[in-house]
């Protein structure tokens, strides 16, 4: 996994991942940023053709004017209650988003830190979940480049620190590049 401090909407990868609501309409956070940067009308039409997404699953639309080829919409829900089930649900969102990109023959995917803002997943937990799922996916899909894109320096530094610590616990599996 590669860490990127920047704007996911500018990533020139095969796909970018969006943290989406089940109605696939623009919502706050990264979702709103993606809709604003894309041709909003075209993206809303593409999402409208799909209709709804199931929580924990992912659906794909064209990029609608962004540098990437596809937008993978990972459908989440609020973390308010927390617990193991919520953690598994968020892990499924990452897993299904990466799997969807793989099924579309994507060789590079930009993934944001999903659900830690408006969906209320605590940021350190969100970082660990993202790191665990991305590392596991890389083991079984070594040809795919996965970029964890973080929009703010403090979150970027937190992610590097937390995932470097879990890296040491994984006995040196290299994923922080």
Describe each region flagged by the PLM.
Residues 1-103:
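Glycine-/small-residue-enriched capping loops at alpha/beta junctions
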């Amino acid at each position: 996994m590669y860490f990127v401090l920047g704007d996911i909407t500018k990533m020139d990868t095969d796909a970018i991942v969006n943290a989406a609501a089940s109605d696939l309409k623009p919502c706050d956070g990264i979702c709103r940023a993606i809709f604003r940067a894309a041709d909003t009308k075209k993206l809303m039409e593409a999402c409208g053709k799909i209709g709804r997404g199931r929580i924990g699953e992912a659906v794909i639309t064209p990029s609608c004017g962004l540098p990437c080829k596809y937008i993978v919409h990972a459908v989440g829900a609020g973390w308010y209650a927390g617990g193991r089930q919520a953690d598994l649900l968020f892990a499924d969102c990452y897993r299904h988003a990466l799997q969807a990109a793989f099924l579309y023959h994507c060789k590079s995917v930009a993934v944001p830190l999903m659900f830690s803002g408006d969906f209320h997943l605590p940021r350190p937990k969100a970082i660990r979940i993202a790191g665990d799922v991305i590392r596991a996916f890389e083991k079984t899909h070594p040809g795919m480049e996965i970029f964890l894109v973080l929009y703010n320096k403090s979150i970027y530094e937190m992610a590097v620190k937390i995932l470097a610590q879990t890296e040491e616990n994984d006995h040196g599996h290299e994923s922080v590049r």
